Amino acid sequence: MIIGCLEAGIKYVGSEVIIGITLEDHWEVVRAAEKHKAEVMMLENVCYRRDVMAILNMVRQGLFGEIIHLQGGYQHDLRDVKFNDGKHVHGFGVEFGAKGLSEARWRTEHAIHRNGDLYPTHGIGPIANCININRGNRFKSICSFASKTRGLHDYVVKLGGENHPSAKVNFKLGDIVTTSINCMNGETILLQHDTNLPRPYSLGFRVQGTEGLWMDVNNSIYVENKAAKVHQWDDAKDWLEKYDHPLWKRWVKESVDAGHGGMDFFVLHSFIESIKRKTSTPMDVYDAASWSAITALSEQSIELGNQTIDFPDFTNGQWMYRKPVFCLNDEF
């Protein structure tokens, strides 16, 4: 669909996550965008989450020192999304596919046939912006591991019994998929995909540098020589308020009724403002391809016995010369 839009002459294309299934899908989108001199922006709204943008502001002001390690992921119990009774969107049964409703009609099939990080962009997008991926830095190599798979089968048996047809399905997706990425500038990234087991929602963010770190799971920050107590966490609230991103300060009222806590306003605002101003989008086709391709690459790594594989350079070397553009001010 993205390529179809580009071939139809559309110069600004907004895409849901993700932009392709195979690695070649991603290359085709990149080549098409370059051929038609068009902008492709994957509308990854978590890049605009308020705490995430405050942390980005802190990173850019040097509060954490030189960034060393980052973590993120998609940690969300989706069992009652992958199965339902065909009448309710969430839960009340263990049907999927043609007998399911909403996401259960398609999402569960991925867990049957694929084994990799199936939804990486919520986690990787925000932390990629913290270390200027594709703009002075890039992903160098990737390696993934998948745990055994038990969660979906156990869920089906508990709700539908061991004789239900869904209990006979062999699920391929590991309950926990862990991906490690090395970057050209020396940072390491850890991503986790965790959707088949009981747990509260979390994207598992961690941004750590030579002077301190932030972890969203415990909503805490520690900055050396600035924390209230040595070796003890500060509640992140005061830090996040102090370093609230200028974009949020300016547009918070307009975002009140937008989806996902206001994030949707900001990502759409950025896309539309880029069109109006006839300028490049703050997240472009190279970002979309790099973040989205993690799925295909993680599948490949797992299939090869957890082999470390080279990460493709979708910019064809231009990452060395491109400058950061994401949310540098309060405009968009």
Which stretches of residues belong to each language-model region?
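Short N-terminal edge-element motif at the start of the domain
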Residues: 168-181
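Beta-strand-loop-alpha-helix segment that lines the small-molecule cofactor/substrate pocket
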Residues: 1-48, 62
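Glycine-rich phosphate/pyrophosphate-binding beta-alpha loops
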Residues: 173, 191-202
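C-terminal helical cap and adjacent loop that interface with cofactors, partners, or active-site loops
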Residues: 128, 198-332
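Predominantly a Rossmann-like dinucleotide-binding segment in NAD(P)-dependent oxidoreductases
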Residues: 39, 46-170
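Active-site beta-strand termini and strand-to-loop segments that position acidic
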Residues: 179-185, 209
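Aromatic/hydrophobic pocket-lining residues that form π-stacking "cages" and hydrophobic walls in ligand
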Residues: 1, 29, 55, 297-298
